């Protein structure tokens, strides 16, 4: 009888206690969440709330936390709050880059944020440096640490608009992924 009660209690505790949060921060999930957040305000708010709870120091996950701050600036109407989110994102990106300065995914996230910040704010100081790391990371693929689908996403983004010079675009077009 006591054994039965212990098993019953154990079953209750495992169903009621919160599960381990690490699964919520898998890179595959974060990539999907960020893509949704960049297109939809409700998804952005959920992504921001989720990432606000992240307190570990995994460099790529930190970069997604920075991206969650930046995406909130997109949907915020108040200029002061927009700037606050962008500056917080910058601080988080700085920490992520310090932890892994050669990671092309971290640099890509920061590049995408800084590229869309108005130049007169002087908050886009890493574009050239980040672009160099991104291109070098793509050249090293599949030894860059990124899955092929992410590498393709990055390459495709870098080939659009004015993200790269024509010479850089030619290099990117010649990278086989």
Predicted regions and their residues:
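Bacterial Sec-dependent N-terminal signal peptides
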Residues: 1-26
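Helix-turn-helix repeat elements of alpha-solenoid scaffolds
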Residues: 35-48, 82-90, 123, 127-131
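Canonical positions in the second alpha-helix
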Residues: 50-51, 89, 96, 134
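Terminal, low-structured helical/coil segments at or just beyond the last alpha-helical repeat
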Residues: 134-177
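Structural register within alpha-helical repeat arrays
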Residues: 65, 72, 110, 154-158
